[in-house]
Design a protein with these regions (language model features):
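Q-loop/switch helix immediately C-terminal to the Walker
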Residues: 85, 91-105
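Walker B catalytic motif
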Residues: 167-168
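The feature captures the beta-strand-to-loop junction immediately N-terminal to the Walker
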Residues: 33-35
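GG-anchored amphipathic helix commonly corresponding to the ABC/SMC/Rad50 NBD signature/C-loop
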Residues: 143-164
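ABC ATPase NBD Q-loop/coupling interface
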Residues: 58-74, 137
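Conserved structural motif at the start of ABC-family nucleotide-binding domains
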Residues: 2, 17-19
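H-loop/switch region of ABC-family ATPase nucleotide-binding domains
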Residues: 197-199
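Helix-to-loop junction immediately C-terminal to a conserved catalytic motif
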Residues: 48-49
Length: 217
């Protein structure tokens, strides 16, 4: 579960979130809605621990309080975020990136097993053959980087307590929506929590039963 109490957040002198509170139980998906500028993406980034955001209040998951932890420790505690615009990383290829994730997150498996698994994930999400050797830099499109990040989410499912999805379908083809739905359902089946921000009407309707409207928060 994740419990957020009296969470406020600002970037520089601009306060974006003010005393937000909610709880998401294991196996639930929370749809976060609100007008542009209401802080939907900022809420996810605050939970993830983006360093330029100043936050106060409480963010608790099963492993404890997160509010004072840096981003990498929140990741190790079981929080994963799929970004609306995943950053490019110079000087590293995709396979090296996954090896680093395996090391940091202490995921079991040999290098050959990791290569086999990641290749199958890349095929599943629709990335081109040989993707594991591609540089993870500006040569990769935004859609390709987003697909790559979604495969990371699948790879880390067993360790993820809280999955943060910021416009996961943005910039992707229509066929990717079902894969996002599958990812959300599998996370819920494993008693993880999902926080979803999306402008996709079908996804909004599908997950509208449990909703936080920041326009009325």
């Amino acid at each position: 579960m994740i419990s957020v109490e009296n969470l406020s957040a600002s970037i520089g002198d601009k306060q974006i979130l003010n005393n937000i509170s909610f709880t998401v139980e294991p196996g639930e998906c929370l749809l976060i809605t609100g007008p542009n500028g209401s802080g939907k993406s900022t809420l996810l980034h605050t939970i993830m621990g983006r360093p330029d955001i100043t936050a106060s209040g409480s963010i608790k998951i099963r492993s404890g309080e997160l509010i004072d932890l840096p981003c990498h420790e929140r990741s190790q505690a079981g929080v994963f975020m799929a970004h609306q615009s995943p950053p490019a990383i110079d000087g590293i290829n995709t396979m090296t990136l996954f090896k680093e994730i395996q090391k940091v997150q202490n995921v079991a498996g040999s290098t050959s097993e990791l290569i086999k698994l990641t290749k199958s994930l890349f095929t599943w999400i629709g990335l081109p053959e040989g993707w594991e050797k591609r540089p993870f830099n500006n040569g990769a499109s935004g859609g390709e980087r987003k697909k790559n990040e979604l495969t990371q989410a699948v790879y880390l499912q067993n360790k993820t307590q809280v999955l943060l999805l910021d416009e996961p379908d943005s910039g992707l083809e229509q066929s990717s929506r079902q894969k996002i739905i599958d990812l959300i359902q599998e996370t819920k089946n494993r008693n993880g929590c999902v926080l979803l921000v999306t402008h996709d009407k079908e996804l909004q309707e599908l997950y509208s039963a449990n909703k936080l409207d920041l326009g009325n928060a």
